[in-house]
């Protein structure tokens, strides 16, 4: 199906939140959307993000931490920023690109339950989007 839409999840370091969002996006939206994630910087995939997603049987060990790709950004149908920093510093998006902000706490450097909570919140938000388009 070549006429898939493109959704692009952005956060500061493409380490935790946007990695989880990419994985949930592929699970819930993969049949209709090309799903990508990136950051203003590339901090590497957080090992606890990998562990948290493994807990819900989603393997993100092959996902990479990438900086924002202008080509993907410019052709994206929807850009979703996941933290206030990325929302403020995100490159300008072309007029045809729909951009929304879904804020989630950054679990990096926090206790393990924070990773589980943020993982579940992101999963629920993307599931809702897959069901309602909002």
Curated annotation (Swiss-Prot):
GO molecular function: arsenate reductase (thioredoxin) activity; protein tyrosine phosphatase activity
Pfam family, one: LMWPc
SMART domains with a match to the protein in the record: LMWPc
Catalytic activity: arsenate + [thioredoxin]-dithiol + H(+) = arsenite + [thioredoxin]-disulfide + H2O
GO cellular-component term (any): cytoplasm
InterPro entries: Arsenate_reductase_ArsC (IPR014064), Ptyr_pPase (IPR023485), Ptyr_pPase_sf (IPR036196)
Active site residues according to the UniProt entry: 11, 83, 90
Gene name for this UniProt entry: arsC
S-S pairs: 11-83, 83-90
Enzyme class: oxidoreductase
This protein's name: Arsenate reductase
Source organism of this protein record: Bacillus anthracis
Function: Catalyzes the reduction of arsenate [As(V)] to arsenite [As(III)].
One Gene Ontology biological process: response to arsenic-containing substance
Entry EC number(s): 1.20.4.4
Family named by the database record: Belongs to the low molecular weight phosphotyrosine protein phosphatase family. Thioredoxin-coupled ArsC subfamily.
């Amino acid at each position: 199906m070549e006429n898939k839409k493109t959704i692009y999840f952005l956060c500061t370091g493409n380490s935790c939140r946007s990695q989880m969002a990419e994985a949930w996006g592929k699970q819930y939206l993969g049949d209709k959307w090309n799903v990508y994630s990136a950051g203003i910087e590339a901090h590497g995939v957080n090992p606890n993000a990998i562990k948290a997603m493994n807990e819900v049987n989603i393997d993100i060990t092959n996902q990479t931490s990438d900086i924002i790709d202008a080509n993907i950004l410019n052709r994206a149908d929807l850009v979703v920023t996941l933290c206030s920093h990325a929302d403020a510093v995100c490159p300008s998006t072309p007029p045809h690109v729909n951009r929304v902000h879904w804020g989630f706490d950054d679990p990096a450097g926090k206790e393990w339950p924070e990773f589980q909570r943020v993982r579940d919140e992101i999963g629920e938000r993307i599931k809702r989007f897959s069901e309602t388009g909002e």
